[in-house]
Each structure stands twice: as C-alpha cells, then as structure tokens.
C-alpha cells in the first residue's frame, strides 16, 4: 500500500514538472521570437528622432546601405507597393546568441505619411501576395498605423521586402491633402551590438576596462573567457568577461592599454536608412491634364489639316 502511494506521488510530481516545463518553453519561445521588433517599440514613442535619425541605429552600430522604391504618384484609396531592399553578401555568417555561426536575419521599419497604412488583405492582389510571401507586418503603435515594422526574417529569402500600402482618400480624411509626401525607411541585416538596456551583445568588440598586464585567461565551459588584468596603477586585479562569439586577440603576459580591443569585432551586419517621395495625386487634376493634352493634340491635327488645305488652295491658284 505504501509503495503504491509513493508511486502515485512520484507520478504526480513528474506530471507537474513536465507541465511546468512545457509552459516555460512556450512562454520563452514566444517572447524570444517577438522580441526584435518590440525593442524599439518599447523604448521609443516614435522611431524617427527630431534629427531624422532612426532609433534602430542605437543598437545596430555599423552603417550599411538600404534602398526604397515607391511609385512617383498614386491616386487616393489605391493599393501600391513599397519595395525595401537590404543588400548584403549572402555568404556571410553572423555570431548567434549562443556563440555559434548562423545565417543573417533582416528587419525593416517603414515610416509613411499620416493617413497611409498597411493595405487590408482583401485589397491585395494575388500577384502582390506572391511577392510579399509569408511576411507578417505590424503597426509600430495601435495609434500609429502609418509606421510599419517587420522582422527579424531570414535574409536569404527576404533581402527584398514588399510592403502593401493603401493610400488615403482626402474625401474621407480631412487632414489629408493632395501633396508630395516624404517616406522614410530603416533596414538592418544581422544582430545588434547593444541591447536596449545598454548592455553589449556578443556581436561586438570587447575592450579592456583597465591598463596593465594580462595575468590569466580562463576559457569558460560554455564558451567565452574570463580575462584577469593586473592594473598598472596599483596592481589590483580587474576581471573582464567575454561572452561566446568574439575571437580573443590578447594572450597571457601581454601588456595592454585602457580600451584596447581584447577581441575581434564579429559583426558582419549593420543598419541603414533612406527616404523617398510620393505624390498623392488628385484624380480631377489628372483628368484635367488628360483633357489638356487631348485638346493640344486635336489642335495640332486641325493645324496640319488647315495647312494642307491652304497648300491645296495655293496650288490651284498657281495652276489657274
């Protein structure tokens, strides 16, 4: 009887342990997968500072190119493509959080004029859906539907990102006018060098926090190093912790300076930003332009016909 109770207790504890483990796995997996776009969203009300700098550059320190392509002009209540290109060498591998090498991911933030927003699914054509692929876009804030973020997504598949955009209609939105508007974009490839809390990631260079002699270098079991430096000023020891990923550049017994790089810089990615302009075109203005062009063409035709008629009259008078 006692053995049976013991078995039941063990079974109950094992079931509880497995359930808790599954819950922790699901929660952590979700938070990790959704973390990247949220970094900027949690820390900044607007991703574009007053200076024009996009805040993603605070974590992605290397400067890399990005390109955006939009139509020169669009009509109201029209779906169009905003194509963001984030070029990089597909052969490159980045340092992952565990110190291993892996493929680069990409992400982008698109800052549209007020009134422009992500097109609803039922307004997107099958051809455009095919270009978009399995990308999932979200608004930067529920109240800022004109600012869209996406990523991280595999860079090898999505180095070109197609945003489906719906233009506003001034007839229904009184704060929107038929004008030329700017569009801003930021795009990154690879992991950042600094987390939003100010701590370094393992995808950056680590510098010495003291000048002196490297007394000891201990390789940690899970990767990374502990570097003990004997301070040159008073001899006290300073320990610098290097996470897995960066390659060590110093050795024991070496004399180093303050802020001297202890590791290589493993970062192969970077962030870039760009801009474009788009005109919200008045349909009546387009119709007026077409009418004007048609009238000019008709006037030219009548002028040619009149000239030929005049030449015929002159020719008949000369023959007479």
Curated annotation (Swiss-Prot):
Signal sequence residues: 1-35
Residues binding heme: 36, 56, 59-60
Spans traversing the lipid bilayer: 286-306
Major subcellular site: plastid
Gene3D superfamilies xrefs: 2.40.50.100, Cytochrome f large domain, Single helix bin
Required co-factors: heme
Protein name: Cytochrome f
Source organism (scientific name): Liriodendron tulipifera
Lineage of origin: Eukaryota, Viridiplantae, Streptophyta, Embryophyta, Tracheophyta
């Amino acid at each position: 009887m006692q053995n049976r109770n013991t078995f039941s207790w063990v079974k109950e504890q094992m079931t509880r342990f497995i359930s808790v483990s599954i819950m922790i796995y699901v929660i952590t997996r979700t938070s990790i997968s959704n973390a990247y776009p949220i970094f900027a969203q949690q820390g900044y009300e607007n991703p574009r500072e007053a200076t024009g700098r996009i805040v993603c550059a605070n974590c992605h320190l290397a400067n890399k190119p990005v390109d955006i392509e939009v139509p020169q002009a669009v009509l109201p209540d029209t779906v169009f493509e905003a194509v963001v290109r984030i070029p990089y060498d597909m052969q490159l591998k980045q340092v992952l959080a565990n110190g291993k090498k892996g493929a680069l991911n990409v992400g982008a933030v698109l800052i549209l004029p007020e009134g422009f927003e992500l097109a609803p699914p039922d307004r997107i054509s099958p051809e455009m859906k095919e270009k978009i692929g399995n990308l999932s876009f979200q608004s930067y804030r529920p109240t800022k539907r004109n600012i869209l973020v996406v990523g991280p997504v595999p860079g090898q598949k999505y180095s070109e990102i197609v945003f489906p955009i719906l233009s506003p209609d001034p007839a229904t939105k009184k704060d929107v006018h038929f004008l030329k508007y700017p569009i801003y974009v930021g795009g990154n490839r690879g992991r950042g060098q600094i987390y939003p809390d100010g701590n370094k990631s393992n995808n950056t260079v680590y510098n010495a926090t003291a000048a002196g002699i490297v007394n000891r270098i201990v390789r940690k079991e899970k990767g990374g190093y502990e570097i003990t430096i004997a301070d040159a000023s008073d001899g006290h020891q300073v320990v610098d912790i290097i996470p897995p990923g960066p390659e060590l550049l110093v050795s024991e017994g070496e004399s180093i300076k303050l802020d001297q790089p202890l590791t290589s810089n493993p970062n192969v990615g970077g962030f870039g930003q760009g801009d474009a302009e788009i005109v919200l075109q008045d349909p009546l203005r387009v119709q007026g332009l077409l009418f004007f062009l048609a009238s000019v063409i008709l006037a030219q035709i009548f002028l040619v016909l009149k000239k030929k008629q005049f030449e015929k009259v002159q020719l008949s008078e000369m023959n007479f």
